[in-house]
């Protein structure tokens, strides 16, 4: 699937190594390969954006390596492709040897996979399913500060799906574990690939059912109900958490304004 980059090759360039992204001048490289000293490198076409190819190059650059978070304010489709590139680069880096027999692996020519010629095992990129849920109680929404994000941002609850668990069960369990409340009338909203490191966020809205807030201090600094027109600092636009909060606010405005 990969190829040698030629002088006149053009497009968007995802140059990635160890979950980092090359961001000269703080932006994704876009244009001719020759302008970015990429001629002769191997590249894998991982998608298309606005009619131009998006290329993945597995390479470390001495300067300007940053996090894919730095391009979160790009259009959603381009951010998604950047995340795909970083995740694929890490997949290829971490699967050089077979986990069953220890022999060297090689990339598939037909799909995003690594193959073992010795035992014929096949590996695919790992994707971790997560749930994220906005919980509404009349004119208020449940928002929390997470232990791992000590930046004053308040957001909705989220967590990983466990083995043998449905998405609906994961929502009920995570909400109970983190906040001590029960929810009802769960409704699917959307999903978002989230490359931190390799999650698929599955977003829901729910209504408060019963219980008082009792936080899990290992997960949350605090949690509270916030009226829709008096909200604290929120996650940035482009995140599925912000989408859920804005959708909940819109529902409240329709009923209470």
Curated annotation (Swiss-Prot):
Residues reported in the UniProt entry to bind a divalent metal cation 1: 158, 178, 219
Sequence positions that bind a divalent metal cation 2: 174
Enzyme class: hydrolase
One Pfam family recorded for the sequence: Zn_ribbon_NUD
Domain of life according to the entry: Bacteria
CDD domains in alphabetical order: NUDIX_NADH_pyrophosphatase_Nudt13
EC number: 3.6.1.-, 3.6.1.22
Keyword Ion transport: no
Nudix hydrolase domain residues: 125-248
Binding site for Zn(2+): 98, 101, 116, 119
UniProt-listed SUPFAM superfamilies: Nudix (SSF55811)
Claim: Magnesium is one of the keywords in the record: yes
GO MF, one annotated term: NAD+ diphosphatase activity
Keywords per UniProt: Hydrolase, Magnesium, Manganese, Metal-binding, NAD, Zinc
UniProt cofactor(s): Mg(2+); Mn(2+); Zn(2+)
InterPro entries, per the entry: NAD-cap_RNA_hydrolase_NudC (IPR050241), NudC-like_C (IPR049734), NUDIX_hydrolase-like_dom_sf (IPR015797), NUDIX_hydrolase_CS (IPR020084), NUDIX_hydrolase_dom (IPR000086), RNA_Hydrolase_NudC (IPR022925), Znr_NADH_PPase (IPR015376)
Motif Nudix box mapped to chain: 159-180
UniProt-annotated binding residues for substrate: 69, 111, 124, 192-199, 241
Cofactor note: Divalent metal cations. Mg(2+) or Mn(2+).
Substrates-to-products reaction catalysed: a 5'-end NAD(+)-phospho-ribonucleoside in mRNA + H2O = a 5'-end phospho-adenosine-phospho-ribonucleoside in mRNA + beta-nicotinamide D-ribonucleotide + 2 H(+); NAD(+) + H2O = beta-nicotinamide D-ribonucleotide + AMP + 2 H(+); NADH + H2O = reduced beta-nicotinamide D-ribonucleotide + AMP + 2 H(+)
Family: Belongs to the Nudix hydrolase family. NudC subfamily.
UniProt-listed HAMAP family: Nudix_NudC
Function noted in UniProt: mRNA decapping enzyme that specifically removes the nicotinamide adenine dinucleotide (NAD) cap from a subset of mRNAs by hydrolyzing the diphosphate linkage to produce nicotinamide mononucleotide (NMN) and 5' monophosphate mRNA. The NAD-cap is present at the 5'-end of some mRNAs and stabilizes RNA against 5'-processing. Has preference for mRNAs with a 5'-end purine. Catalyzes the hydrolysis of a broad range of dinucleotide pyrophosphates.
PANTHER family recorded: NAD-CAPPED RNA HYDROLASE NUDT12 (PTHR42904:SF6), NUDIX HYDROLASE, NUDC SUBFAMILY (PTHR42904)
Name this protein carries in UniProt: NAD-capped RNA hydrolase NudC
Biological source species: Salmonella typhimurium (strain LT2 / SGSC1412 / ATCC 700720)
């Amino acid at each position: 699937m990969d190829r040698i980059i030629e002088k006149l090759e053009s497009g968007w360039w995802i140059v990635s190594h160890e979950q980092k992204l090359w961001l000269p001048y703080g932006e994704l490289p876009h244009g001719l390969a020759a302008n970015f000293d990429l001629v002769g490198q191997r590249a894998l076409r991982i998608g298309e954006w606005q009619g131009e190819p998006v290329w993945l190059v597995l390479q470390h650059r001495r300067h300007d390596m940053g996090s894919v978070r730095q391009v979160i304010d790009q259009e959603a489709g381009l951010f998604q492709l950047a995340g795909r590139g970083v995740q694929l680069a890490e997949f290829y880096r971490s699967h050089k040897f077979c986990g069953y027999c220890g022999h060297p692996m090689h990339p598939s020519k037909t799909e995003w996979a690594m193959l073992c010629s010795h035992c014929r095992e096949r590996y695919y990129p790992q994707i971790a399913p997560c749930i994220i849920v906005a919980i509404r109680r009349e004119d208020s929404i449940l928002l929390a500060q997470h232990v791992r994000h000590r930046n004053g941002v308040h957001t909705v609850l989220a967590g990983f799906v466990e083995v043998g668990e449905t998405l609906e069960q994961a929502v009920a369990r995570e909400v109970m574990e983190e906040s001590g409340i029960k929810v009802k009338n769960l409704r699917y909203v959307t999903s978002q690939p989230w490359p931190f490191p390799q999650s698929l966020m599955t977003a829901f809205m729910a209504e408060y059912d019963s219980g008082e807030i009792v936080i899990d201090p290992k997960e949350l600094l605090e949690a509270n109900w916030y009226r829709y027109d008096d909200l604290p600092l929120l996650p940035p636009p482009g995140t599925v958490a912000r989408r859920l909060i804005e959708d909940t606010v819109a529902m409240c405005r329709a009923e209470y304004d």
